[in-house]
């Protein structure tokens, strides 16, 4: 059976001066889905604790919209057939991401770091780190607009302000976010810990 080539591969093989960008977990105002909502929502709800599966160690490389734009500008000035990874200069863990968001919003909470995935699921929960090699982009002259903590502020503030209206924020029953915001299960866990002490 013949293998079907992906659209980026087909574009690259034409020899035309087309640059294909491969970002990872995109963040920025208007991001869909806005993954950082799992922590922003907790702050808005004044949750006393943040639960993180795999002890928050999961790393799935983030990509700021501002960094994508910076790479597009460089690639457009030097047209050639190529495929470039696009990612932030750092690759924060889920724990680091939660801390960046809480700090920006002036919120403090207890960190409940769990070894399993029964609670504390989040969008960066991967067994093995996913980190993109951006050396080709850097060799082209690309300079990131900023690291994760610097660039994610735009999305955080956008979410706190209500996005672009009610429909731009995740619905409480959204299948992507609902498992990450199971407050009833978390409260039960915290209550059990208090009674066993």
Give the positions of each predicted feature.
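Glycine-rich Rossmann NAD(P)(H)-binding loop
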Residues: 28, 52-58, 84-92, 124-125, ...
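Substrate-positioning beta->alpha
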Residues: 6, 34-39, 52-76, 82-85
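A short C-terminal helix-loop "cap" of Rossmann-like NAD(P)-dependent dehydrogenase/epimerase domains
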Residues: 40-53, 107-112
């Amino acid at each position: 059976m013949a293998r079907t080539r992906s659209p980026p591969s087909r574009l690259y093989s034409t020899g035309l001066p087309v640059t294909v960008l491969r970002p990872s977990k995109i963040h920025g105002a208007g991001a869909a889905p806005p993954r950082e909502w799992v922590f922003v929502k907790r702050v808005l709800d004044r949750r006393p604790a943040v639960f993180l599966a795999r002890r928050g160690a999961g790393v799935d490389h983030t990509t700021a919209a501002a960094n994508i734009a910076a790479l597009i500008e460089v690639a457009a000035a030097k047209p050639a057939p190529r495929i470039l990874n696009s990612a932030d200069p750092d690759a924060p863990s889920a724990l680091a991401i939660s801390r960046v968001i809480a700090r920006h919003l002036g919120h403090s909470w207890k960190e409940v770091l769990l070894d399993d995935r029964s609670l504390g699921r989040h969008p960066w929960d991967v067994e093995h780190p996913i980190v993109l090699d951006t050396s080709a982009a850097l060799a082209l002259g690309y300079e990131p607009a900023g690291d994760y903590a610097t660039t994610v502020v735009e999305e955080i503030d956008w979410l706190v302000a209500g996005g672009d209206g009610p429909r731009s924020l995740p619905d409480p029953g959204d299948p992507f976010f609902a498992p990450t915001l199971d407050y009833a299960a978390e409260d039960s866990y915290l209550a059990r810990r208090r009674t066993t002490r």
